[in-house]
Protein backbone atom coordinates (compact mmCIF):
# COMPACT_ATOMS: atom_id res chain seq x y z
CA UNK A 1 0.00 0.00 0.00
CA UNK A 2 1.44 3.34 -1.06
CA UNK A 3 0.23 6.60 0.47
CA UNK A 4 0.84 10.04 -1.05
CA UNK A 5 0.23 12.82 1.45
CA UNK A 6 -0.24 15.72 -0.93
CA UNK A 7 -1.28 19.32 -0.49
CA UNK A 8 -4.50 18.93 -2.48
CA UNK A 9 -5.46 15.34 -1.62
CA UNK A 10 -4.40 12.04 -0.11
CA UNK A 11 -3.87 9.19 -2.57
CA UNK A 12 -3.71 5.49 -1.79
CA UNK A 13 -2.43 2.92 -4.29
CA UNK A 14 -2.16 -0.85 -4.22
CA UNK A 15 0.78 -2.48 -5.97
CA UNK A 16 1.30 -6.21 -6.50
CA UNK A 17 4.57 -6.91 -4.68
CA UNK A 18 5.57 -9.67 -7.12
CA UNK A 19 4.65 -8.18 -10.51
CA UNK A 20 4.90 -4.46 -9.73
CA UNK A 21 1.47 -3.97 -11.30
CA UNK A 22 -0.72 -1.19 -9.92
CA UNK A 23 -3.89 -2.94 -8.75
CA UNK A 24 -5.86 0.21 -8.05
CA UNK A 25 -5.86 3.64 -6.48
CA UNK A 26 -8.17 6.06 -4.70
CA UNK A 27 -7.98 9.60 -3.44
CA UNK A 28 -9.70 11.72 -0.85
CA UNK A 29 -11.18 14.27 -1.03
CA UNK A 30 -12.49 14.27 -4.59
CA UNK A 31 -12.00 18.04 -4.72
CA UNK A 32 -9.05 19.76 -2.99
CA UNK A 33 -8.11 20.09 0.64
CA UNK A 34 -8.24 23.61 1.96
CA UNK A 35 -5.12 25.69 2.48
CA UNK A 36 -5.65 28.07 5.40
CA UNK A 37 -4.09 31.52 4.96
CA UNK A 38 -4.58 33.64 8.12
CA UNK A 39 -2.28 36.30 6.65
CA UNK A 40 -0.75 37.00 3.23
CA UNK A 41 2.19 34.67 2.64
CA UNK A 42 1.00 32.15 5.21
CA UNK A 43 -0.16 28.63 4.34
CA UNK A 44 -1.43 26.07 6.84
CA UNK A 45 -3.36 22.80 6.90
CA UNK A 46 -4.86 20.79 9.74
CA UNK A 47 -2.87 17.53 10.10
CA UNK A 48 -5.98 15.78 11.40
CA UNK A 49 -7.61 16.53 8.05
CA UNK A 50 -4.75 14.64 6.38
CA UNK A 51 -5.39 11.72 8.72
CA UNK A 52 -9.16 11.74 8.09
CA UNK A 53 -8.63 11.62 4.33
CA UNK A 54 -5.92 8.99 4.71
CA UNK A 55 -8.47 6.77 6.46
CA UNK A 56 -11.01 7.38 3.70
CA UNK A 57 -8.52 6.78 0.87
CA UNK A 58 -7.27 3.51 2.38
CA UNK A 59 -10.76 2.20 3.07
CA UNK A 60 -11.85 3.18 -0.44
CA UNK A 61 -8.96 1.55 -2.31
CA UNK A 62 -9.40 -1.69 -0.34
CA UNK A 63 -13.15 -1.80 -0.94
CA UNK A 64 -13.08 -0.81 -4.62
CA UNK A 65 -10.53 -3.51 -5.43
CA UNK A 66 -12.00 -6.19 -3.16
CA UNK A 67 -8.77 -6.45 -1.16
CA UNK A 68 -8.79 -7.58 2.44
CA UNK A 69 -6.61 -5.61 4.82
CA UNK A 70 -4.81 -8.83 5.74
CA UNK A 71 -3.46 -9.01 2.17
CA UNK A 72 -1.40 -5.82 2.62
CA UNK A 73 2.20 -6.84 3.27
CA UNK A 74 3.74 -3.39 3.83
CA UNK A 75 3.02 0.34 3.71
CA UNK A 76 5.11 3.12 2.14
CA UNK A 77 4.54 6.86 2.51
CA UNK A 78 5.41 9.79 0.24
CA UNK A 79 4.60 13.27 1.46
CA UNK A 80 4.66 17.01 0.86
CA UNK A 81 8.04 18.22 2.08
CA UNK A 82 9.17 20.82 4.64
CA UNK A 83 5.94 21.11 6.65
CA UNK A 84 5.98 21.50 10.45
CA UNK A 85 3.67 19.46 12.69
CA UNK A 86 3.80 20.03 16.47
CA UNK A 87 2.31 17.58 19.01
CA UNK A 88 2.20 17.42 22.80
CA UNK A 89 2.98 14.48 25.10
CA UNK A 90 -0.43 12.97 24.32
CA UNK A 91 0.39 13.18 20.59
CA UNK A 92 -2.32 15.80 20.12
CA UNK A 93 -1.78 18.40 17.41
CA UNK A 94 -1.07 21.80 18.97
CA UNK A 95 -1.59 24.02 15.91
CA UNK A 96 -2.16 23.79 12.18
CA UNK A 97 0.79 22.52 10.21
CA UNK A 98 2.87 25.28 8.62
CA UNK A 99 3.28 23.81 5.14
CA UNK A 100 5.90 24.05 2.40
CA UNK A 101 4.51 27.12 0.59
CA UNK A 102 4.28 29.28 3.74
CA UNK A 103 6.82 32.11 3.66
CA UNK A 104 6.56 33.59 7.16
CA UNK A 105 10.00 32.32 8.26
CA UNK A 106 12.02 33.72 5.34
CA UNK A 107 13.61 36.52 7.34
CA UNK A 108 14.37 34.19 10.25
CA UNK A 109 16.33 31.96 7.88
CA UNK A 110 18.10 34.94 6.34
CA UNK A 111 19.16 36.16 9.78
CA UNK A 112 20.50 32.72 10.70
CA UNK A 113 22.47 32.54 7.46
CA UNK A 114 24.04 35.91 8.22
CA UNK A 115 24.51 35.22 11.91
CA UNK A 116 26.16 31.83 11.51
CA UNK A 117 27.98 32.89 8.36
CA UNK A 118 27.65 31.54 4.84
CA UNK A 119 30.72 29.30 5.07
CA UNK A 120 29.60 27.62 8.29
CA UNK A 121 26.03 27.13 7.09
CA UNK A 122 26.95 25.79 3.69
CA UNK A 123 29.82 23.56 4.81
CA UNK A 124 27.66 21.87 7.47
CA UNK A 125 24.08 22.18 6.19
CA UNK A 126 24.87 22.37 2.43
CA UNK A 127 21.96 24.85 2.37
CA UNK A 128 20.85 28.18 3.70
CA UNK A 129 18.44 27.67 6.65
CA UNK A 130 15.97 29.52 4.45
CA UNK A 131 12.25 29.13 4.96
CA UNK A 132 12.46 25.46 5.88
CA UNK A 133 11.18 23.45 8.83
CA UNK A 134 13.77 24.54 11.41
CA UNK A 135 13.08 28.20 10.64
CA UNK A 136 9.31 27.62 10.88
CA UNK A 137 9.83 26.09 14.34
CA UNK A 138 11.87 29.11 15.39
CA UNK A 139 8.95 31.29 14.24
CA UNK A 140 6.63 29.35 16.56
CA UNK A 141 9.11 29.82 19.42
CA UNK A 142 9.26 33.58 18.80
CA UNK A 143 5.59 34.24 18.14
CA UNK A 144 3.61 31.48 19.88
CA UNK A 145 5.51 30.77 23.07
CA UNK A 146 2.37 29.35 24.71
CA UNK A 147 2.28 26.68 22.00
CA UNK A 148 6.03 26.13 21.85
CA UNK A 149 6.14 25.41 25.59
CA UNK A 150 3.71 22.49 25.08
CA UNK A 151 5.59 20.84 22.19
CA UNK A 152 6.87 17.36 22.91
CA UNK A 153 7.82 16.41 19.34
CA UNK A 154 7.94 18.03 15.91
CA UNK A 155 7.40 16.11 12.71
CA UNK A 156 7.11 16.34 8.96
CA UNK A 157 3.75 15.55 7.30
CA UNK A 158 4.72 11.97 6.44
CA UNK A 159 6.01 11.38 9.96
CA UNK A 160 2.64 12.48 11.32
CA UNK A 161 0.67 10.02 9.20
CA UNK A 162 3.11 7.24 10.11
CA UNK A 163 2.58 8.18 13.77
CA UNK A 164 -1.19 7.97 13.43
CA UNK A 165 -0.81 4.52 11.85
CA UNK A 166 1.76 3.11 14.27
CA UNK A 167 1.68 5.22 17.42
CA UNK A 168 5.45 5.75 17.06
CA UNK A 169 7.05 9.18 16.55
CA UNK A 170 9.87 8.63 14.07
CA UNK A 171 11.60 10.43 11.19
CA UNK A 172 14.50 9.76 8.83
CA UNK A 173 17.86 11.36 8.11
CA UNK A 174 16.44 12.38 4.74
CA UNK A 175 13.51 14.01 6.52
CA UNK A 176 15.75 15.95 8.89
CA UNK A 177 17.83 17.13 5.94
CA UNK A 178 14.77 18.49 4.10
CA UNK A 179 14.00 20.52 7.22
CA UNK A 180 17.64 21.78 7.22
CA UNK A 181 18.13 20.00 10.54
CA UNK A 182 20.92 17.67 9.34
CA UNK A 183 24.67 18.27 9.61
CA UNK A 184 26.22 16.58 6.57
CA UNK A 185 29.74 17.01 7.93
CA UNK A 186 29.05 15.52 11.37
CA UNK A 187 26.43 13.00 10.21
CA UNK A 188 23.92 13.94 12.91
CA UNK A 189 21.18 16.50 13.64
CA UNK A 190 22.37 20.04 13.02
CA UNK A 191 23.36 21.26 16.47
CA UNK A 192 24.83 24.47 15.06
CA UNK A 193 21.43 25.61 13.77
CA UNK A 194 19.37 24.19 16.63
CA UNK A 195 21.61 25.93 19.16
CA UNK A 196 21.47 29.19 17.21
CA UNK A 197 17.67 29.01 17.20
CA UNK A 198 17.54 27.94 20.86
CA UNK A 199 15.67 24.75 19.96
CA UNK A 200 15.98 21.68 22.19
CA UNK A 201 17.21 18.70 20.16
CA UNK A 202 14.88 16.55 22.26
CA UNK A 203 11.96 17.90 20.23
CA UNK A 204 13.18 15.91 17.23
CA UNK A 205 11.86 12.43 16.56
CA UNK A 206 14.22 9.47 16.70
CA UNK A 207 15.44 8.40 13.25
CA UNK A 208 14.72 5.15 11.44
CA UNK A 209 16.13 4.02 8.07
CA UNK A 210 14.23 5.19 5.00
CA UNK A 211 13.76 1.53 4.06
CA UNK A 212 13.01 -1.04 6.75
CA UNK A 213 10.73 -1.61 9.71
CA UNK A 214 9.42 1.73 11.02
CA UNK A 215 6.49 0.54 13.14
CA UNK A 216 3.31 -1.46 12.73
CA UNK A 217 -0.36 -0.58 12.41
CA UNK A 218 -2.07 -0.31 15.78
CA UNK A 219 -5.45 -1.91 16.51
CA UNK A 220 -6.97 1.58 16.69
CA UNK A 221 -5.62 2.59 13.25
CA UNK A 222 -6.67 -0.78 11.85
CA UNK A 223 -10.24 -0.16 12.97
CA UNK A 224 -10.27 3.22 11.25
CA UNK A 225 -8.74 2.10 7.94
CA UNK A 226 -9.56 -1.56 7.36
CA UNK A 227 -5.91 -2.54 7.60
CA UNK A 228 -4.73 -5.51 9.63
CA UNK A 229 -3.13 -4.78 13.04
CA UNK A 230 0.60 -5.44 12.86
CA UNK A 231 0.99 -4.46 9.18
CA UNK A 232 4.46 -2.86 8.94
CA UNK A 233 5.27 0.63 7.73
CA UNK A 234 8.51 0.09 5.81
CA UNK A 235 9.27 3.27 3.83
CA UNK A 236 8.83 7.02 3.91
CA UNK A 237 10.30 9.89 1.90
CA UNK A 238 9.49 13.42 0.78
CA UNK A 239 7.79 13.76 -2.58
CA UNK A 240 10.84 14.84 -4.58
CA UNK A 241 13.27 12.16 -3.30
CA UNK A 242 10.42 9.69 -3.72
CA UNK A 243 9.83 10.80 -7.31
CA UNK A 244 13.53 10.24 -8.02
CA UNK A 245 13.31 6.79 -6.42
CA UNK A 246 10.25 5.93 -8.53
CA UNK A 247 12.33 6.75 -11.62
CA UNK A 248 15.22 4.58 -10.38
CA UNK A 249 17.42 7.64 -9.85
CA UNK A 250 19.74 6.30 -7.17
CA UNK A 251 23.31 6.75 -8.37
CA UNK A 252 25.66 9.57 -9.38
CA UNK A 253 25.00 10.89 -12.87
CA UNK A 254 21.29 10.05 -12.78
CA UNK A 255 18.77 12.90 -12.87
CA UNK A 256 15.04 12.95 -12.20
CA UNK A 257 13.02 15.72 -13.80
CA UNK A 258 9.46 16.97 -13.70
CA UNK A 259 7.95 19.80 -15.72
CA UNK A 260 4.43 20.47 -14.52
CA UNK A 261 3.34 23.93 -13.38
CA UNK A 262 6.87 24.34 -12.08
CA UNK A 263 9.90 22.31 -13.07
CA UNK A 264 12.18 20.31 -10.81
CA UNK A 265 15.52 18.69 -11.54
CA UNK A 266 16.84 16.31 -8.89
CA UNK A 267 20.31 14.84 -9.28
CA UNK A 268 22.25 12.33 -7.19
CA UNK A 269 25.78 13.01 -5.98
CA UNK A 270 28.27 10.90 -4.02
CA UNK A 271 30.03 14.02 -2.75
CA UNK A 272 29.38 16.43 0.12
CA UNK A 273 29.41 19.67 -1.86
CA UNK A 274 27.41 22.87 -1.97
CA UNK A 275 26.70 25.75 -4.32
CA UNK A 276 28.45 28.86 -2.91
CA UNK A 277 25.52 30.98 -4.14
CA UNK A 278 22.95 28.66 -2.51
CA UNK A 279 20.86 28.40 -5.67
CA UNK A 280 19.98 24.74 -5.09
CA UNK A 281 19.07 22.55 -2.12
CA UNK A 282 20.81 19.36 -1.04
CA UNK A 283 19.08 16.59 0.88
CA UNK A 284 20.01 13.11 2.06
CA UNK A 285 18.74 10.79 -0.69
CA UNK A 286 16.63 7.71 0.04
CA UNK A 287 19.50 5.22 -0.43
CA UNK A 288 22.20 7.13 1.46
CA UNK A 289 24.35 5.19 3.91
CA UNK A 290 27.54 6.07 5.81
CA UNK A 291 29.58 3.87 3.50
CA UNK A 292 27.93 5.06 0.28
CA UNK A 293 27.12 8.77 0.18
CA UNK A 294 24.00 9.55 -1.82
CA UNK A 295 22.84 13.15 -1.65
CA UNK A 296 20.03 14.58 -3.72
CA UNK A 297 20.58 18.02 -5.26
CA UNK A 298 17.31 19.75 -6.07
CA UNK A 299 16.59 22.85 -8.08
CA UNK A 300 13.28 24.34 -9.02
CA UNK A 301 12.24 26.64 -11.87
CA UNK A 302 8.84 28.15 -11.12
CA UNK A 303 7.95 29.21 -14.65
CA UNK A 304 7.86 26.01 -16.71
CA UNK A 305 4.54 24.35 -17.56
CA UNK A 306 2.66 27.39 -16.31
CA UNK A 307 4.13 29.38 -19.20
CA UNK A 308 3.05 26.73 -21.69
CA UNK A 309 -0.44 26.94 -20.14
CA UNK A 310 -0.36 30.73 -20.53
CA UNK A 311 0.56 30.37 -24.22
CA UNK A 312 -2.36 27.97 -24.64
CA UNK A 313 -4.74 30.42 -22.98
CA UNK A 314 -3.75 33.49 -24.97
CA UNK A 315 -3.82 31.54 -28.25
CA UNK A 316 -7.60 31.55 -27.71
CA UNK A 317 -8.37 28.73 -30.13
CA UNK A 318 -9.25 25.93 -27.69
CA UNK A 319 -6.04 24.21 -28.68
CA UNK A 320 -5.02 20.98 -27.01
CA UNK A 321 -1.46 20.69 -25.72
CA UNK A 322 -0.83 17.93 -28.25
CA UNK A 323 -1.85 20.32 -31.04
CA UNK A 324 0.45 23.02 -29.67
CA UNK A 325 3.30 20.51 -29.70
CA UNK A 326 2.59 19.67 -33.34
CA UNK A 327 2.50 23.36 -34.29
CA UNK A 328 5.77 24.02 -32.44
CA UNK A 329 7.43 21.16 -34.33
CA UNK A 330 6.82 22.91 -37.67
CA UNK A 331 9.53 25.47 -36.81
CA UNK A 332 13.24 24.69 -36.95
CA UNK A 333 15.31 24.52 -33.73
CA UNK A 334 16.19 28.00 -32.55
CA UNK A 335 12.79 29.43 -33.53
CA UNK A 336 14.49 31.67 -36.12
CA UNK A 337 16.08 33.77 -33.39
CA UNK A 338 13.00 34.24 -31.19
CA UNK A 339 13.77 33.86 -27.48
CA UNK A 340 11.34 33.45 -24.58
CA UNK A 341 12.60 33.52 -20.98
CA UNK A 342 10.09 31.70 -18.73
CA UNK A 343 10.59 33.55 -15.45
CA UNK A 344 7.06 34.87 -14.97
CA UNK A 345 5.91 32.90 -11.94
CA UNK A 346 7.58 34.63 -9.02
CA UNK A 347 11.13 34.84 -7.74
CA UNK A 348 13.52 32.20 -9.04
CA UNK A 349 16.04 30.79 -6.58
CA UNK A 350 18.39 29.72 -9.39
CA UNK A 351 18.55 33.44 -10.28
CA UNK A 352 19.39 34.53 -6.74
CA UNK A 353 15.70 35.03 -5.84
CA UNK A 354 15.34 37.74 -8.47
CA UNK A 355 12.02 38.16 -10.22
CA UNK A 356 12.81 39.28 -13.78
CA UNK A 357 9.44 38.30 -15.24
CA UNK A 358 8.84 36.49 -18.49
CA UNK A 359 10.27 38.26 -21.53
CA UNK A 360 10.23 37.81 -25.30
CA UNK A 361 13.28 38.85 -27.31
CA UNK A 362 14.08 39.39 -31.00
CA UNK A 363 10.44 39.31 -32.08
CA UNK A 364 10.19 40.19 -35.78
CA UNK A 365 6.67 40.88 -37.06
CA UNK A 366 7.68 39.84 -40.57
CA UNK A 367 9.15 36.46 -39.57
CA UNK A 368 7.62 35.13 -36.39
CA UNK A 369 4.17 33.70 -35.82
CA UNK A 370 2.29 31.52 -33.40
CA UNK A 371 4.38 28.44 -34.14
CA UNK A 372 7.59 30.34 -33.34
CA UNK A 373 6.16 31.50 -30.01
CA UNK A 374 5.11 27.98 -29.05
CA UNK A 375 8.51 26.55 -29.92
CA UNK A 376 10.52 29.39 -28.37
CA UNK A 377 8.56 29.00 -25.13
CA UNK A 378 9.36 25.29 -24.94
CA UNK A 379 12.99 25.93 -25.81
CA UNK A 380 13.16 28.62 -23.12
CA UNK A 381 11.83 26.20 -20.52
CA UNK A 382 14.41 23.60 -21.55
CA UNK A 383 17.24 26.14 -21.28
CA UNK A 384 16.00 27.31 -17.86
CA UNK A 385 16.16 23.74 -16.56
CA UNK A 386 19.56 23.26 -18.17
CA UNK A 387 20.82 26.37 -16.40
CA UNK A 388 20.07 24.53 -13.17
CA UNK A 389 21.72 21.36 -14.45
CA UNK A 390 24.87 23.39 -15.10
CA UNK A 391 24.89 24.43 -11.44
CA UNK A 392 24.85 20.73 -10.56
CA UNK A 393 27.72 20.10 -12.95
CA UNK A 394 29.71 22.85 -11.26
CA UNK A 395 29.14 20.94 -8.01
CA UNK A 396 30.71 17.83 -9.53
CA UNK A 397 27.60 16.02 -10.74
CA UNK A 398 28.25 14.27 -14.04
CA UNK A 399 24.92 14.24 -15.85
CA UNK A 400 24.50 11.02 -17.83
CA UNK A 401 20.77 10.36 -18.00
CA UNK A 402 17.61 12.35 -17.29
CA UNK A 403 14.57 10.29 -16.30
CA UNK A 404 11.05 11.66 -16.24
CA UNK A 405 7.47 10.51 -16.26
CA UNK A 406 5.48 10.56 -19.48
CA UNK A 407 3.52 13.65 -18.52
CA UNK A 408 3.24 17.42 -18.86
CA UNK A 409 6.06 19.07 -20.84
CA UNK A 410 7.80 15.75 -21.46
CA UNK A 411 4.91 14.79 -23.76
CA UNK A 412 6.31 17.35 -26.20
CA UNK A 413 9.00 15.99 -28.57
CA UNK A 414 10.26 19.56 -29.08
CA UNK A 415 10.83 20.10 -25.36
CA UNK A 416 12.32 16.67 -24.69
CA UNK A 417 14.67 16.76 -27.68
CA UNK A 418 15.80 20.31 -26.89
CA UNK A 419 16.69 19.32 -23.32
CA UNK A 420 18.52 16.25 -24.58
CA UNK A 421 20.47 18.24 -27.17
CA UNK A 422 21.64 21.03 -24.89
CA UNK A 423 22.41 18.82 -21.88
CA UNK A 424 24.07 16.01 -23.81
CA UNK A 425 22.18 13.52 -21.65
CA UNK A 426 19.95 10.66 -22.69
CA UNK A 427 16.31 11.22 -21.74
CA UNK A 428 14.31 8.20 -20.62
CA UNK A 429 10.54 8.50 -20.13
CA UNK A 430 8.54 6.19 -17.88
CA UNK A 431 4.97 5.52 -16.87
CA UNK A 432 4.92 6.35 -13.16
Task: Identify the residue ranges that each predicted region occupies.
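Carbohydrate-associated surface elements
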Residues: 102
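Active-site neighborhoods of enzyme catalytic cores
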Residues: 80, 214, 346
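Conserved residues at the C-terminal ends of beta-strands
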Residues: 78, 210, 405
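Short linear loop/turn motifs
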Residues: 205-213, 325-328
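Active-site core segments that coordinate phosphate-bearing ligands/cofactors
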Residues: 1-2, 14, 106, 113-170, ...
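Residue-level structural signal for beta-strand termini and adjacent loop
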Residues: 27-28, 98-99, 175
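A conserved beta-strand/loop element that lines the FAD pocket in flavoprotein oxidoreductases
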Residues: 202
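N-terminal glycine/serine-rich phosphate-binding loop of ATP-dependent small-molecule kinases
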Residues: 1-95, 107, 123, 150, ...
Amino acid sequence: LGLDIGTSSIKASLVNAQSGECVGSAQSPSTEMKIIAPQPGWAEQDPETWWQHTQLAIASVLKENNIDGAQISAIGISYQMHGLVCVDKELKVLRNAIIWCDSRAVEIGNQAFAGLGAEKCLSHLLNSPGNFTASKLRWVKENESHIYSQIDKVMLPGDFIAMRLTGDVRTTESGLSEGIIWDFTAGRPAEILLNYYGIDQGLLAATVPTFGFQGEVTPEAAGLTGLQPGTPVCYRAGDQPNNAFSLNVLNPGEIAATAGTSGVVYGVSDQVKYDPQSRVNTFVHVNHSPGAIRNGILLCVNGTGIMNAWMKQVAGENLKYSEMNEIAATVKPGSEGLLVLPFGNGAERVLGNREPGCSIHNLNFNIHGKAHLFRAAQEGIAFALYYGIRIMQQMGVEVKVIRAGKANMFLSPVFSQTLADISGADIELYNT
